Structure formats: structure tokens, C-alpha cells
Amino acid sequence: MQINRLLATLLAAILLSPIQPIATAQHPPCCGPISPAGARLASFLDNMDVESLWLANQHINWETGKPDRGAGYEGPGNHTHCSAFAAAAAMRLGVYLLRPPQHGQELLSNAQGEWIAGPEGQKAGWRPVSDMHRAQHLANEGHLVVVLFPNPDPHSPGHVAIVRPSEKSAHALEADGPEVIQAGQHNHNKICVRIGFENHPGAFPSGVRYYTHPLQ
């Protein structure tokens, strides 16, 4: 009798629970499948170990992300390192993104935003991307894609992240933007643009800009 009551309770719970959508059938990828080149890019980004390196509140070597000053250092360049991480990742992929020594680490993301949109960025092979759907698609195809928010206040830092391959749905893309990897106040191997840029009012969705560079 007790077993019957337990079974009845379990059955009622199952019947009353919401039916979860089948991801592949009802929510197909927004931006195409991840190509072999996209899979290689994703593996490369995973191996950057961003959640252990380029950490905030310490001075770091921009190329390696490792601390290069003592624990008590309180001078300039010890805050966040989104732009150093983006430049280091691009360099390892054989792509130039404005970096030291051409520009110091302080306010580098703002300078990268100005540089990449200008003639020097175009000469280096960077091209603007029309929208976030195209940005995610290009990343899935294995292209290097960055998303930038130069701060309207030139004395305050902006933000930059790298779009990583993802098979997120169109609904998730519209709500949260592309999937990115970033350093910042908190480093994330995988996070959406909406949350990754939330400390910058006016950034997502209309304030950010996307740029791409082909990879060999």
C-alpha cells in the first residue's frame, strides 16, 4: 500500500513537471555547426588557461599572463587584463592586435578599439562584422573574432573579449549574445557577451563592436 502511494506521488510529479524542449529539434544552433577549424580554435582557446592566468589585481606579463611583480605591488597596471589576454591569444594565432610595446597595458582596450577600427587595423587584416549572428558564425567557422567596447570616457577602461565557437540557439544568442572567453574582474573560459560586459553600461547589445581576422 505504501509502495502504491509512493508510485502515485512519483507519477504525479512527472506529469506535472514542465516538458523540457529537445535542444536539437526545437532549438537548433543559431549560427551553423562548429567546423573542424572551429573545433581547433575552441581547443586552442581552452588551452590558454585564462581562468588561472591574466588574473585581476596583480601586475602580469602580458604575453604569458603570469605575475611579474611582487605580491605587494600597488602601482599601475595591476587591475584587469582583458586587452592583454586578447592580444596574447591573437599573437599565438599569428595575428597582430595592438599590444605592448606599441601601447602600454593601461587603457589598452580603448586603444585597441580605436586602432582596430582605423586604417592600421584594416592594414593588419581586421574587418568589421555586421552583427552578433555573423560574429558567432565566423567563430564557428574558425575565424578569430573579437568583441570590443571602447569606453566613452577615455580615462576609464573599456573591455574586449574573444568570441569562441558555440552551438547556442538563436533564442540564446538574441538574449545573451555570442559565447566568449575573457579576462577581466573575473576570468571566464566560457561566458556570454551580456554577462561578460555587464560592468560596462551601454555595452550590450548595441554598444559593442565585432571584428574578425582570418586564420591560416
List where the protein language model places each region.
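Sec/Tat signal peptide C-region and signal peptidase I cleavage site
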Residues: 20-25
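Low-complexity, Gly/Ser/Thr/Pro-rich intrinsically disordered linker/tail segments
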Residues: 176-216
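N-terminal capping segments
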Residues: 26-107
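Bacterial N-terminal signal peptides
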Residues: 8-18
